[in-house]
Amino acid sequence: MPRVKRGVTAHARHKKVIAQAKGYRGRRKNVYRVANQAITRASQYAYRDRRQRKRQFRALWIVRINAAARECGLSYSRLISGLKRAAIEIDRKVLADLAVRDKAAFTTIAEQAKVALSD
């Protein structure tokens, strides 16, 4: 068996890591060991935050819907309950967008929810 020298493979791997660390500051951009740690940590943060972003946006939508609902004389929970009773299937993302961009449409929906609650 001939001896396997891994210099080419190792160099390619190091090059790949250094390329991923482009834009980092200090030794994180050009020292393999430090860059590798930085990239690993960055990947972990990215993975975690892709999931957190979904939670944060939902929380933002709920805050916006609640504020608009209170202007219409309803709390958030009563509005959602009224929408379910009225069989209006609009998700929170669209409701929040209506609350910000089209107050008249949101008010109409809120009124329908009020009617459904009183029945």
From Swiss-Prot:
GO biological process, one term: ribosomal large subunit assembly
InterPro entries noted in UniProt: Ribosomal_bL20, RIBOSOMAL_L20_CS, Ribosomal_protein_bL20_C
GO cellular component: ribonucleoprotein complex; ribosome
Domain of life: Bacteria
Record GO terms (molecular function): rRNA binding; structural constituent of ribosome
Keyword RNA-binding: yes
Keywords for this protein: Ribonucleoprotein, Ribosomal protein, RNA-binding, rRNA-binding
Matches recorded under Pfam families: Ribosomal_L20 (PF00453)
Role noted for this protein: Binds directly to 23S ribosomal RNA and is necessary for the in vitro assembly process of the 50S ribosomal subunit. It is not involved in the protein synthesizing functions of that subunit.
Family classification: Belongs to the bacterial ribosomal protein bL20 family.
HAMAP family (UniProt xref): Ribosomal_bL20 (MF_00382)
The protein's name in its UniProt record: Large ribosomal subunit protein bL20
Gene: rplT
